[in-house]
Amino acid sequence: MNKIRKGDEVVVIAGRDKGKRGKVNRVQKDGKLVVSGVNMVKRHTKPNPMLGTAGGIVEKEAPIQASNVAIFNSATDKPDRIGFKILEDGKKVRIFKSTNELVDN
């Protein structure tokens, strides 16, 4: 069970985009995340008349290491750590370490 999942709001805690917030768009198998508006890179693309795409410089999000982000806790308005808890019915859920509240509602 991954600590950070697609759709979570995260804060970058290390690197050139430190302090930025964004939503996780994709979680890769190698432990990297694609976060909206974070780690923007420029790609030079060729025009492709078959697909109808124009060439030029395209700015897009690049993957960032999961260790460089922390989940955002809206209750405390701060980045937080994630723990796991097993409920009475045997279901394993994610909780915020600081408040012990469930991440998934």
Swiss-Prot record:
Top-level taxonomic group: Bacteria
One cellular component term from this protein's GO annotations in UniProt: ribosome
Keywords of this entry: Ribonucleoprotein, Ribosomal protein, RNA-binding, rRNA-binding
Q: Which GO terms describe its molecular function?
A: rRNA binding; structural constituent of ribosome
PANTHER family reported for this sequence: MITOCHONDRIAL RIBOSOMAL PROTEIN L24
Family, per entry: Belongs to the universal ribosomal protein uL24 family.
Which HAMAP family has this protein been placed in? Ribosomal_uL24_B
Assembly information from the UniProt record:
Part of the 50S ribosomal subunit.
Q: Tell me the protein's name.
A: Large ribosomal subunit protein uL24
Q: What gene is this protein translated from?
A: rplX
